[in-house]
Design a protein with these regions (language model features):
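Residues that scaffold the ATP/ADP-binding catalytic core of kinase and kinase-like folds
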Residues: 13-15, 46, 122
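Short, conserved alpha-helical segments within structured domains
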Residues: 39-40, 60, 81, 101
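Short, well-structured N-terminal submotif of metal-dependent ribonuclease cores
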Residues: 1-38, 53-62, 118
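Active-site neighborhoods of divalent-metal-dependent phosphate/nucleic-acid chemistry enzymes
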Residues: 73-117
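Acidic, PIN/NYN-like endoribonuclease modules and their adjacent C-terminal/linker elements
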Residues: 1-3, 36, 102, 106-139
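Active-site-proximal, substrate-binding regions of enzyme catalytic domains
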Residues: 44-72
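Phosphate- and divalent-cation-binding pockets in alpha/beta enzyme and binding domains
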Residues: 23, 42, 84, 121-122
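Helix N-cap/coil-helix junction residues
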Residues: 55-56, 94, 128
Length: 139
């Protein structure tokens, strides 16, 4: 894949070792990686959660946050995506946060890569399913 949209669940796997992290890391080799500009807050929230649970110490989480802030993601302002994201959210009963990713993927005609299986299932039998790919299905 040359140009992709990734969500925060994929970006978090760049810095937190979990199932399919290696597949997520390989996406960093794509020519272009896009995300709505709220992606970073969502990905860093994963680190915060790991600190709260005692899975990471704050210093380590801070270093991983720095890796995320330096990642090659092309962030798109969410204001221009909001109308389509809202329509997607209402039609498919997903959060605005999640629908922003698929709105961007639709706008750019790029695949959306996610590590969120529930999100993939939400769009399984809809026309948007062609846009959404679970990172676990990558080769």
């Amino acid at each position: 894949m040359k140009k992709v949209v990734v969500d925060a669940s994929v970006a978090a796997k760049w810095v937190v070792e979990e199932a399919h992290s290696a597949k997520a890391v390989r996406l960093l080799d794509c020519d272009e990686i896009h995300a709505p500009d709220h992606w970073l807050a969502e990905a860093v929230n994963v680190l915060w959660s790991k600190v709260l649970k005692g899975d990471l110490d704050a210093k380590d989480a801070n270093e991983r946050m720095t890796v995320l802030t330096r990642s090659p993601v092309i962030a798109t302002p969410i204001a221009g995506l909001m109308a389509s994201a809202f329509a997607i959210a209402v039609e498919h009963s997903v959060t605005i946060y999640d629908s922003l990713y698929i709105a961007l993927a639709e706008e750019r005609a790029f695949p959306l890569l996610t590590a969120d299986e529930k999100f993939v299932r939400r769009f399984q039998d809809t026309p948007l399913s062609k846009r959404v790919t679970w990172v676990g299905d990558l080769g």
